[in-house]
Design a protein with these regions (language model features):
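Generic structural motif
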Residues: 4-7, 16-31
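Residues immediately C-terminal
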Residues: 9-12, 104
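Buried, small/hydrophobic-residue-enriched core segments of structured protein domains
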Residues: 33-183
Length: 183
């Protein structure tokens, strides 16, 4: 029956305790379901009628502070390290960060439509990631003349991809822009 806010840590990664998974809603925890060997299966939260979130300050010019913010806010758990698609190890500097702003899958949502009205936040997020490592932003040719671009941040490269699926796949974009292995 604990009360949680949006962004309140629910649990941590037992291998890397800095990596947290946070509450997506504010409300009251109603159930914690565990499986074999106490494996966490689900956490149920009864949402409040009004959502209240924890506030986080965006760091100005420090890559390490950006990583700390990602860890504290629970967003670090959504990052993926290639080639094994695992959560990256905090404290290990990445070579590059890839962000794909489109999906070429059939019936996929149009990211430009989804991000409408949040272009400033999107650009601030890309600029913050660029303080950690060079960012490669993958877009399709239809997005070149949208409010998502241009992004005027150092260390941000915009790469335009076109073609059928899997052109929007991050792995394909990595292979075309900066391959993990050139062998």
């Amino acid at each position: 029956g604990d009360a949680v806010l949006v962004g309140t840590p629910l649990f941590v990664d037992k291998a890397t305790e800095q990596v947290k998974v946070v509450s997506p809603v504010s409300g009251t925890i109603t159930a914690v379901e565990r499986g074999e060997r106490r494996k966490l299966l689900s956490i149920r939260i009864q949402p409040d009628s009004v959502q209240v979130a924890k506030d986080f300050e965006l760091p100005v010019n420090d890559g390490e502070a950006v990583v700390r913010l990602l860890l504290e806010s629970g967003l670090f758990a959504y990052l993926r390290q290639r080639p094994y698609d695992v959560v990256p190890t905090p404290g290990v500097a990445p070579r590059d960060i890839f962000v794909s702003a489109f999906s070429s899958m059939p019936l996929a949502a149009d990211f430009t439509y989804v991000a409408a009205g949040q272009e400033v936040d999107f650009k601030a997020g890309i600029a913050a990631l660029a303080k950690v490592a060079p960012v490669h932003l993958g877009v399709n040719d239809e997005q070149l003349n949208t409010p998502l671009l241009p992004i005027s941040a150092p260390q941000v490269t915009v790469a335009c991809f076109r073609g059928p699926n899997p052109a929007g796949n991050v792995g394909v974009q990595i292979n075309r822009v900066a391959p993990v292995n050139k062998g």
